[in-house]
Amino acid sequence: MNKPVAPNSYKTGPDEEGMFGIFGGRFVAETLMPLILELQQAYETAKNDPEFKAELNALSTFYAGRPSKLYYAEGLSKHLGGAKIYFKREDLNHTGSHKINNCLGQILLAKRMGKTRIIAETGAGQHGVASATIAARFGLPCIVYMGATDVERQKPNVFRMKLLGAEVKPVSAGNGTLKDAMNEALRDWVTNVEDTYYLIGTAAGPHPYPELVRDFQSVIGTEARQQILEQEGRLPDVIVAAVGGGSNAIGLFHPFLDDASVKIVGVEAGGRGLEGEEHCASMSAGRPSVLHGNRTYLLQNADGQILEGHSVSAGLDYPGVGPEHSWLKDSGRVDYVPILDNEALDAFQLCTRTEGIIPALESAHAIAQAVKMAPTMGKDKVMIVNLSGRGDKDVHTVGKLLGMDI
């Protein structure tokens, strides 16, 4: 197969219809179309408004704690004996992950649009916590849809959301995971169009969500690019991030897309292996179709039915991925690779013991890829891994899997 011709820039998408090549778009019910167009108009206006930018910057700095640090993981780097590994410390943000970046931007949009009720979906609970947090900060009611399976395995985050005043609605349809929670949130939105803002947590969904979530998360890569130039005097050789829906990854990747010297690697949930259906590696083992308002790579059976998938990480068990990632895969700019549950668990423990940092299981997938790659690289090479969140929420899951009684 001929290698696709590289575009002049990888940063120009999406087009007016929300397409990244053949991916993206807005495949939604007619009742939602006016809302989607209203959101797009509000976003186009907001992103060119200095006041909006100033308010978002102030909240990011004084409320969320940005910029997050770029930290040289010396213990892990020396243990592996190859490339220098840097962590982009999104785990240090308020609420403990990258999710707050997007939530701050979207709550300001909701305010501009005059919406008085916030709904959100969540998998690992991090986006639910971030949504509940900013809803509390702005005095708005918040309903969070969460798969019943995830409610069970993420109890600390469920309690946090309730503490913050949010109503958590468990969804038992399907496998009771992120896909099902998103379905319910979309149903709610259709029936409450006047007053409700749907605060999507990942870079998927109908246009303009993939674009606006990417833009709000790109602060990660913008900072990391500047920080590595200050600390190493050059760009990294490799950047790595975990990909579920793909918001933390696109946030890191986007500012580096046109830097040809930087290799970019997205890490999918390989679960128990790609041979069966117990994984969530939609780009390694899926094919394009439509889900949640956009065309993208999805896990499907022979009849085109969406599969449920599996991952040890609640934040990665989504059977699809943001459309921009699908386009970046097909264009050849980004490599997407699967990491198995046991590899992520090993990396979780290794990071904890060599760095004194307990990473989220999502981030542990990215670290596992670093564990594979770094030893094959020279000691003069530099790698950035996005530490997308902290692992407090996962200690019970990991403890159970390791046979510990917590």
Curated annotation (Swiss-Prot):
It comes from Brucella suis (strain ATCC 23445 / NCTC 10510). One of its GO terms (molecular function) is tryptophan synthase activity. The keyword Amino-acid biosynthesis applies. It is an enzyme of class 4 (lyase). Pathway: Amino-acid biosynthesis; L-tryptophan biosynthesis; L-tryptophan from chorismate: step 5/5. PROSITE patterns: TRP_SYNTHASE_BETA. Transmembrane segments: none annotated. This is Tryptophan synthase beta chain. GO terms for cellular component: cytoplasm. Keywords: Amino-acid biosynthesis, Aromatic amino acid biosynthesis, Lyase, Pyridoxal phosphate, Tryptophan biosynthesis. Its cofactor is pyridoxal 5'-phosphate. The lineage of its organism: Bacteria, Pseudomonadati, Pseudomonadota, Alphaproteobacteria, Hyphomicrobiales. Tetramer of two alpha and two beta chains.
